[in-house]
Regions:
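Short, Lys/Arg-enriched anionic-surface-contact patches
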Residues: 25-44
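A general alpha-helix detector
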Residues: 9-13, 29, 71
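C-terminal structural segments of small proteins and small subunits
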Residues: 14, 69-96
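Short, amphipathic alpha-helical "recognition" segments used to contact nucleic acids or chromatin
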Residues: 42-56
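General nucleic-acid-binding
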Residues: 1-20
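Short alpha-helical "recognition helix" segments of helix-turn-helix
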Residues: 60-65, 72
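Intrinsically disordered, low-complexity basic tails/linkers immediately adjacent to helix-turn-helix/homeobox/MYB/SANT
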Residues: 89-112
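Residues at alpha-helix boundaries and the short loops/turns that link adjacent helices
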Residues: 20-24, 36, 55
Length: 112
């Protein structure tokens, strides 16, 4: 973790985010906290990170996200040399999606 980030205001923000339980709560909180361009920039970066982690090529990422190659390069640097924050989130999201898919297939398997 970058020690430059460790300060009370940042920890307060992270504690606040950890209090959110639903997608609707996230929408409400982040709409209050951020401007629309800030939210779009963050969502674009995480989408770029996901595509890079799936080994997608820059041209596909540019066309699907509208991100500049400079943004893609910065995100790639974070994936390669960062604190593995993206990796942790993507692993958890993938595990949750797999659990939901398994539960859904179990529901359909039992139906006649």
């Amino acid at each position: 973790m970058n020690e430059k980030l460790r300060e009370l205001n940042v920890e307060f923000l992270f504690s606040a985010v950890l209090q959110l339980h639903t997608m609707e709560e996230c929408y409400d909180f982040f709409e209050d906290l951020c401007t629309v361009p800030e939210l779009r920039a963050m969502s674009q970066r995480i989408h770029v990170a996901k595509m890079l982690s799936e080994k997608r090529v820059y041209s596909d990422i540019v066309s699907q996200t509208g991100a500049s190659t400079a943004t893609i390069s910065r995100v790639k640097r974070s994936l390669d040399y960062g604190c593995d924050g993206y990796k942790i989130v993507f692993e958890r999201m993938d595990a949750e999606a797999a659990e939901k898919a398994e539960a859904a297939s179990g529901e359909t398997d039992g139906k006649e």
